[in-house]
Amino acid sequence: METIVLGVAPREIKKNAAGKLRKTGEVPAVVYHKGEATIAVSVNEIALNKLVHSAESHIIDLKFPDGNVKRSFIKDVQFDPVTDRVIHTDFQLVSANEVIEMDVPVAVEGDAIGVEKGGKLQIIRHSLTVKGKPGDMPAHVTIDVTALEIGHSIHVREIPATAFPGLEIMDDRDTPVVTVLASKKEAEATEAVAGATPEGAA
């Protein structure tokens, strides 16, 4: 997993301050760790968006104006329900030997058999919660969909544990992650056959 440096600056918590901050292209955020005081900061919206919308997860070195650097990861993001802009972010501090739970994006590889037969690949879970040490965290959880047929799904329990040594996927084992759906045309044809009256039946 790549480590990214992200500049942050301390901010004051005042009435309407967050809204004014957003108008300048900055996003209000907090930095916290168990047993430590929470730090209110601001971060550049453009730089933050690149991380939030990335297809990979990252460890983030938060760089303060005084040169102090704190290692962290994005724990939570709040979006505006209308514009979908990032309006607030939580950064959780982390040490090298600390076990954390982190949302890791899902990526697929291979050409699904079901897609070659006319189906449509659908990723149901775009990220999974992974538990482990920061240095062991993958950039993404890669799932091989080559053998996936139409109407079939790959569940959390079917993701090989050997692919992520020292890590544990915390999502429910029965959670479907990716599936192949029948095309609309094929689904309609199947329904037509199922609804047809057998010849001679009356």
From Swiss-Prot:
Keywords: Ribonucleoprotein, Ribosomal protein, RNA-binding, rRNA-binding. Coiled coil: none annotated. GO terms for molecular function: 5S rRNA binding; structural constituent of ribosome. GO terms for cellular component: cytosolic large ribosomal subunit. It comes from the Bacteria. It holds the Pfam family Ribosomal_TL5_C. One of its GO terms (biological process) is translation. CDD domains: Ribosomal_L25_TL5_CTC (cd00495). Part of the 50S ribosomal subunit; part of the 5S rRNA/L5/L18/L25 subcomplex. Contacts the 5S rRNA. Binds to the 5S rRNA independently of L5 and L18. HAMAP family: Ribosomal_bL25_CTC (MF_01334). This is one of the proteins that binds to the 5S RNA in the ribosome where it forms part of the central protuberance. PANTHER family: RIBOSOMAL PROTEIN L25/GLN-TRNA SYNTHETASE, ANTI-CODON-BINDING DOMAIN-CONTAINING PROTEIN, RIBOSOMAL PROTEIN L25_GLN-TRNA SYNTHETASE, ANTI-CODON-BINDING DOMAIN-CONTAINING PROTEIN. Belongs to the bacterial ribosomal protein bL25 family. CTC subfamily. This is Large ribosomal subunit protein bL25.
